[in-house]
Structures are given as C-alpha cells and as structure tokens.
C-alpha cells in the first residue's frame, strides 16, 4: 500500500504543470493546451521578456531609414517619437530564426511609405526566435503579450484605438499576432503570412491564429505541404476569414526543394540554408511586398480546391467580386459574412509576381488539321505574348476554351491575334482560322467578342477585330 501511494503521489507531481509570471504580461503555464498534448508533447515555458529582448522599432514617412525605439517601460518614448496619432499603424512581426531590424521587415515599411502615410513598427524578437524551434514556439506567447501591452499603452495613454492597427506576422510571427489579437478587443486586422504548422496546426484557437483574433483576418499559405515528408513549414489549416492559396499553397513557381534537406532536424534547418530550403515559406511575405504597389494584380478566386481552379471551374469572379491577396485584401472585408473561405490564384516565378487572369473561347473555321492554337491579347495598356489555348485535332466549328494568367493588365481589349501550327510538314497546306474569339477578364463581367472570316496557313498571324 505504501508503494502504491508513493507511485500515485509521484505521478500527480509529474502531472502538475509549472507556471511563470511576468509583471504586466500575466502568467504562462506549460499545461494543456500549451504542453503535454499530442501536438505539443514537451512542456516548455516561454523565456522571460528580458531574455527574449523584444524591441519595437518605429519607422515613419519622416524617418524611413532610421528607426526610433519605443519602450514598454517608458511610454514617453512614443510621444517623443515621430508616431502620428492621425495615421494607421502597421506592426510587422518576423518569424523563426529571423530579425526585425533589417531585411524584408524594413523593406516592407519602405514599400508602405510609397503608398500611404503610416506608423510602421517592426517587432524585433530575434533573440527569442533564434532558439530551438520548440522554445521559439513557446516564446510566441510572451512576444504576443508584449505587442498587446504596447497596444494597451497606445489606447490608455494616448487614446489611440486598436481599430487603427494592423498586425502583419510571418511564420511564427503570425501566431504572435494572433496571441496579441486575442488580448486586444477591437483590433482591426491581422495578416498571417504562411503561419507555421508545427506546434500550432489543429490546436485550440487560444494557441494559434484564428478569425476571432481581429475584426478581419487574412492568411496567405505558400508552404502548406505536410511537414513530414515534404518539409512544408506552413499550415494547410484555414485560420482566417479569407485564406489565400497562391499556386495551390504548397509549391511556389521558382522554388525547388533539395531532397537531402528533408533529413535535417527542424531546430537547425535554417542555419546557412534558410533562403534555399525555405523558399516556399518566404514567398508569402514577398507576395505581400509586391502587392503593396500592385492594387489589382493578385485577384483571388473562390474555389473548393486548386484542382478545380486549374480546371477552369472557378472563373470568372462571382457577383460579390474577388478579393486581392495581400495588402488590399481588407477592401473585401464586409462583403461576405463567412469565415474560412478558400481563394486561389497563380503568380509569376520570380519578382513581378502579379498576374491577371483571362478566359478565352475560340470557335475554329477552315480545314481540319492537327496542331495547336494560340492567341495574344492587345489592349489600350499593352499586349500579352502568345498563349497556347488548345492542342489536338482542329476541326471547323469546334470551340475550345482556356484560362491563362497574363503578366500585365492589357486594359480595354481592342483586338486579338490568332496563330496555329503543328511543326509537321503538311503538303496540302491547310488553312485554319477563328470565326469568333470571346475574351473575359476574370474580375469583370464584360465579355469581348472578336470575329474574322479569314483563314491562314500555319505560323501566320490572323488579326480578329471587335464584332
């Protein structure tokens, strides 16, 4: 009996969680759902604020290149800075093995200054993020509480409301934003840039980013393939009001993974190979960066899956329109009451990521031949290159439809150029044409019609004009 009670007391003691409290931030425990679960088996407490060393670095239109430090311990640093009470404020929060005093974080501030007057605060918690992954994932809680504390200071000391605040977080930083939002009623917006999967996916909402953390939550997924075996860092779980899955959300054009990297331990994976191994994961903030200067180049289409999107089943935009992935996603807020909607789009491979989707339908004329047909669009803003619409048997009277993503918005479409070829010598020299070509831009209801009665031989351009 003595042995029984000894074992029982030992087990009760082992099951009892630990807790640590930090002044002004509250208490943090390692019990469920923060630890001791299937998703978070290790019980780890977050580091102290002093050890994490979070800094709030303010950039404004008046000081775009040199930051001013805002101190939680001294609110007067806000009043002494260039912080403007009549402007919106955007916090940018980096993720695992990253830093907030240079690189993409400060680049984002500078891009913002090109389109708006804004207070841009970079949250630098590099000491807390440059730990083992499991420790950094738990440090998220303290950093989130510190961001919430800064928002509370702005409200209580300067009557600056959270309704003017937007939190932008990448990787672990997305969950930092969620943590801060859960403690800040009335927060306007959170943008999650590829929120990480490990230690957060399928956890209760209090642990991760979720739609209740702000009035509007938009999420961009770029590395959502399973962590095992594909080494996808991001989550596939929908965590916002609007969840965007560019290029399907798993493999981004221009990114290739090294199979050998899959055997590297997660805690050391970023050292020396961050940009190479995490290309998909990093694309989320690169897309956001480019979206700032491209208000209409990232239209995303509601669809059940990327397969359906690629099968031309989700074109054009519905009556309520399509949201823009990235900086201007909030222009769609309020146009739908639903949460966790999926949106899909395609992007370019490297820089110039913006794309404009067009749907084309071609009715053929002339002789029956084997080959492929292509079209190029010409508008008042420019023209596209030739896009392949169909390959196979070209029969007169047959109609072929296809959607493609152009590198530019051609504006009002004025004419279409048709081309066909098969790269095989045909002694009969058949002629093929298009009696009608219809074109629609995905974001518009206008359908452009172009006609021609002519036919042309292989590799000869045929111009169709409005009809």
From Swiss-Prot:
PROSITE patterns: LIPASE_SER, PLAT. Keywords: Calcium, Disulfide bond, Metal-binding, Secreted, Signal. Residues 356-467 form the PLAT domain. GO terms for biological process: cholesterol homeostasis; fatty acid biosynthetic process; high-density lipoprotein particle remodeling; triglyceride catabolic process. Ca(2+) binds at residues 205, 208, 210, 213. May function as inhibitor of dietary triglyceride digestion. Lacks detectable lipase activity towards triglycerides, diglycerides, phosphatidylcholine, galactolipids or cholesterol esters (in vitro). This is Inactive pancreatic lipase-related protein 1. The lineage of its organism: Eukaryota, Metazoa, Chordata, Craniata, Vertebrata.
């Amino acid at each position: 009996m003595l042995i029984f009670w000894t074992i029982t007391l030992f087990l009760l003691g082992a099951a009892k969680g630990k807790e640590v409290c930090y002044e002004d931030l509250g208490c943090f425990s390692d019990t469920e759902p923060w630890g001791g679960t299937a998703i978070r088996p290790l019980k780890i407490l977050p580091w102290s604020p002093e050890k994490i060393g979070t800094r709030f670095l303010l950039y404004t239109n008046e000081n775009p290149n040199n930051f001013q430090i805002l101190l939680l311990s001294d609110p007067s640093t806000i009043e002494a800075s260039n912080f403007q009470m009549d402007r919106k404020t955007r916090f940018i929060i980096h993720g695992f093995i990253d830093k907030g005093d240079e690189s993409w974080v400060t680049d984002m501030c500078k891009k913002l200054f090109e389109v708006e007057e804004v207070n841009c605060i970079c949250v630098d918690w590099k000491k807390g993020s440059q730990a083992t992954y499991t420790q950094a994932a738990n440090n998220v809680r303290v950093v989130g509480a510190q961001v919430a504390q800064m928002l509370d200071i702005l409200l209580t000391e300067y009557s600056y409301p959270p309704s003017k605040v937007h939190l932008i977080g990448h990787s672990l930083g997305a969950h930092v934003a969620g943590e801060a939002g859960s403690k800040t009623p009335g927060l306007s917006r959170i943008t999650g840039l590829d929120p990480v999967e490990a230690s957060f996916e399928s956890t209760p909402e209090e642990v991760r980013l979720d739609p209740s953390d702000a009035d509007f939550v938009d999420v961009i997924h770029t590395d959502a393939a399973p962590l095992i075996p594909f080494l996808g860092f991001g989550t596939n779980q929908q965590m916002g009001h609007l969840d965007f899955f560019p290029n399907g959300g798993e493999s981004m054009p221009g990114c290739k993974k090294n199979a050998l990297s899959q055997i590297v331990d997660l805690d050391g994976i970023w050292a020396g190979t961050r940009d190479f191994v995490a290309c998909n994961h990093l694309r989320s903030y690169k897309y956001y960066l480019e979206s700032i200067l491209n208000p209409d180049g990232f239209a995303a289409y509601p669809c059940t899956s990327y397969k359906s999107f690629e099968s031309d089943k989700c074109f054009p935009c519905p009556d309520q329109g399509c949201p823009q992935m990235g900086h201007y996603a909030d222009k769609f807020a309020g146009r739908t009451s639903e949460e966790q909607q999926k949106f899909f789009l395609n992007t370019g491979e490297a820089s110039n990521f913006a794309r404009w989707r067009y749907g084309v339908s071609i009715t053929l004329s002339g002789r029956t031949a084997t080959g492929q047909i292509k079209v190029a669009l010409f508008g008042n803003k420019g023209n596209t290159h030739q896009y392949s619409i169909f390959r196979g048997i070209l029969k007169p009277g047959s109609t072929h439809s296809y959607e493609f993503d152009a590198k530019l918005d051609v504006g009002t479409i004025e004419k279409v150029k048709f081309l066909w070829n098969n790269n095989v010598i045909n002694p009969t020299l058949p002629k093929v044409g298009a009696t009608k070509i219809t074109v629609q831009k995905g974001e518009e209801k206008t359908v452009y019609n172009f006609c021609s009665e002519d036919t042309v031989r292989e590799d000869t351009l045929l111009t169709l004009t409005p009809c």
